[in-house]
Amino acid sequence: MAAPAVSGFSRQVRCFSTSVVRPFTKLVRPPVQIYGIEGRYATALYSAASKQNKLEQVEKELLRVAQLLKEPKMAASIMNPYIKRSIKVKSLNDMTTKEKFSPLTSNLMNLLAENGRLNNTPGVISAFSTIMSVHRGEVPCSVTTASPLDEATLSELKTVLQSFLSKNQILKLEVKTDPSIMGGMIIRIGEKYVDMSAKTKIQKLSRVMREVF
């Protein structure tokens, strides 16, 4: 039963890789469109995994692939452009068999190898993660402060930020510190950007003072 799905997935990725638009109507459309080669592979994978109800499984497997490719020995045998493609395919088959990856993930890696696109693997994984994040209703938000926030302030901040989201959206918060902003905070939520840092306020004040004097 798995062979037709894998074969279909192969055709989908090849069609996307050669910019053939017609098969797109057969795909399960992702919640967000990712452009470029990585986006095409990720979109085709999302469609195939969605049809088989294996989105979460494939996502976990891709994160594992990302970890494995950071290992020097694995990276040397797969990502090196001077190594023969047949050797890369064998290394990939050994890896996917050892890790017991699903046919979807295994086939993706083989396709990347066959098409000479293994260097695009990190980008494909990143694109798929982005699609899955939107699929879950996650809204990325980064908050930068000059010094770490205490628990009470952080909790209040989360409540305020969550209030700007709809009920089916999930806040995915990342808090960073950057002493150079001097105070206040910089917030980026979704496509919105708000700079309330002391550094920016001082710069604005400086410009106003120059105009006055």
Swiss-Prot record:
Taxonomic lineage from the root: Eukaryota, Metazoa, Chordata, Craniata, Vertebrata
Function: Subunit OSCP, of the mitochondrial membrane ATP synthase complex (F(1)F(0) ATP synthase or Complex V) that produces ATP from ADP in the presence of a proton gradient across the membrane which is generated by electron transport complexes of the respiratory chain. ATP synthase complex consist of a soluble F(1) head domain - the catalytic core - and a membrane F(1) domain - the membrane proton channel. These two domains are linked by a central stalk rotating inside the F(1) region and a stationary peripheral stalk.
Sites of N6-succinyllysine modification: K90, K100, K158, K199
Post-translational modification: In response to mitochondrial stress, the precursor protein is ubiquitinated by the SIFI complex in the cytoplasm before mitochondrial import, leading to its degradation. Within the SIFI complex, UBR4 initiates ubiquitin chain that are further elongated or branched by KCMF1.
Keyword line: Acetylation, ATP synthesis, Hydrogen ion transport, Ion transport, Membrane, Mitochondrion, Mitochondrion inner membrane, Transit peptide, Transport, Ubl conjugation
Membrane-crossing residue ranges in chain numbering: none
The protein's name in its UniProt record: ATP synthase peripheral stalk subunit OSCP, mitochondrial
Similarity-based family: Belongs to the ATPase delta chain family.
Subcellular compartments: Mitochondrion; Mitochondrion inner membrane
Pfam assignment, any one: OSCP
MF terms (GO), sorted A to Z: proton-transporting ATP synthase activity, rotational mechanism
Motif SIFI-degron mapped to chain: 5-23
Subunit field text: Component of the ATP synthase complex composed at least of ATP5F1A/subunit alpha, ATP5F1B/subunit beta, ATP5MC1/subunit c (homooctomer), MT-ATP6/subunit a, MT-ATP8/subunit 8, ATP5ME/subunit e, ATP5MF/subunit f, ATP5MG/subunit g, ATP5MK/subunit k, ATP5MJ/subunit j, ATP5F1C/subunit gamma, ATP5F1D/subunit delta, ATP5F1E/subunit epsilon, ATP5PF/subunit F6, ATP5PB/subunit b, ATP5PD/subunit d, ATP5PO/subunit OSCP.
Tagged with keyword Transport: yes
InterPro entries cross-referenced by the UniProt entry: ATP_synth_OSCP/delta_N_sf (IPR026015), ATPase_OSCP/d_CS (IPR020781), ATPase_OSCP/dsu (IPR000711)
UniProt modified residues of type N6-acetyllysine: K54, K60, K70, K73, K100, K158, K172, K176, K192
Transit peptide segment: 1-23
